A protein has these predicted regions:
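Acidic/His- and Gly-rich active-site-bordering loop/insert found
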Residues: 2-110
Length: 110
């Protein structure tokens, strides 16, 4: 069990870099939305990022295109936290004009 080293996450320099990376990822997802529960591109990106970040286990294809990342605690029996996020877009026409507007006609993150 190679648990993720969480110490770096409190480093202000790391947090600044990560904030910009997460902004780029979020904007990419908005440019390339996937409707419904069919999200192969988005799921692949998330799984690859979790692996790159050193998450202990990454399970793909959960319930279709779902992704589960597991991070082990340092001590046996330690409390666990579960996080969940929707990654699919809605079948709506985007009327915004920002830099990361959807390029998929009739689909957007709202």
């Amino acid at each position: 069990m190679n648990s993720v080293n969480l110490d770096k996450y409190s480093d202000p320099f790391f947090l600044g870099e990560t904030k910009e990376e997460l902004r780029r990822i979020r904007q990419d997802f908005h440019v390339h939305p996937e409707i419904g529960l069919v999200t192969p591109r988005t799921s692949r990106i998330i799984a690859d990022l979790l692996k790159d970040y050193g998450v202990d286990e990454v399970h793909e294809g959960v319930g279709g295109d779902g992704v589960v990342g597991v991070i082990y605690g340092k001590l046996p029996g330690e409390a666990s936290v579960g996080l969940r996020a929707d990654i699919d877009a809605l079948p709506l026409k985007e009327l915004s004009n920002h830099d990361h507007v959807s390029q998929v006609e009739g689909a957007m993150h709202a």
